[in-house]
Curated annotation (Swiss-Prot):
This is Imidazoleglycerol-phosphate dehydratase. HAMAP family: HisB. InterPro entries: IGPD_sf, ImidazoleglycerolP_deHydtase, ImidazoleglycerP_deHydtase_CS, Ribosomal_Su5_D2-typ_SF. It is an enzyme of class 4 (lyase). SUPFAM superfamilies: Ribosomal protein S5 domain 2-like (SSF54211). Disulfide bonds: none annotated. It comes from the Archaea.
Length: 190
């Protein structure tokens, strides 16, 4: 079983995360940001990851530290994963009504993000849309994953939700175990 617990305790956030990569899509997420909980739940469900996340953040300031630190902690959980026999690459194209999100992932030990997301609104509930790209940068830097994404559409809720669903599907594909693979790198290490 590939299950991990990660805790982060700073002056800005207190986070406890439990992740089972080989889960069934069960989730219990409490970040204090309702829409963020919603899209993280979509990530877990569509990635078939069991995810428990308890966060106490300085939301009286804004949601930046909470979103950033969740990306850091989730990234660290995936970085802890044994890389032997994983498929390494994952991708997904997910529609949601008028919106469409494309995500491509390489779990190759090289963090890099190329994101094409332009918000039409500043907020979805109490979630700042400017933090979408920052979440993925925080995740990528800590998971050491190369991540490309592109989102089109009009409805901000649909765009961001489609993106997190595509993220879950692509991560599920990339983390899937294939015993034939060994270390999927000509270098012999990831």
């Amino acid at each position: 079983m590939r299950a991990f617990k990660v805790t982060r305790d700073t002056n800005e956030t207190k986070i406890h995360l439990e992740l089972n990569i080989d889960g069934t899509g069960k989730y219990a997420i409490k970040t204090g940001i309702a829409f963020f909980d919603h899209v993280l739940s979509s990530f877990a469900k569509h990635g078939a990851f069991d995810l428990k996340l308890d966060v106490l953040g300085d939301l009286e300031i804004d949601d930046h530290h909470t979103v950033e630190d969740v990306g850091i902690v989730l990234g660290k959980a995936f970085e802890n994963m044994e890389k032997k026999n994983i498929k390494r690459f994952g991708w997904a194209i997910i529609p949601m009504d008028e919106a469409k999100a494309t995500v491509s992932i390489d779990i190759g030990g090289r963090p890099y993000v190329v994101g094409n997301y332009t918000p039409n609104t500043e907020k979805i509930g109490n979630f700042s849309t400017e933090n979408v790209v920052h979440f993925f940068e925080s995740f990528s830097n800590n998971a050491k994953i190369n991540l490309h994404f592109e989102v089109t559409g009009e409805n901000e809720h649909h765009k961001v939700e489609a993106l997190f669903k595509a993220f879950g599907v692509a991560m599920d594909m990339a983390t899937h175990v294939d015993e034939r693979k060994g270390i999927v790198s000509t270098k012999g290490v990831i």
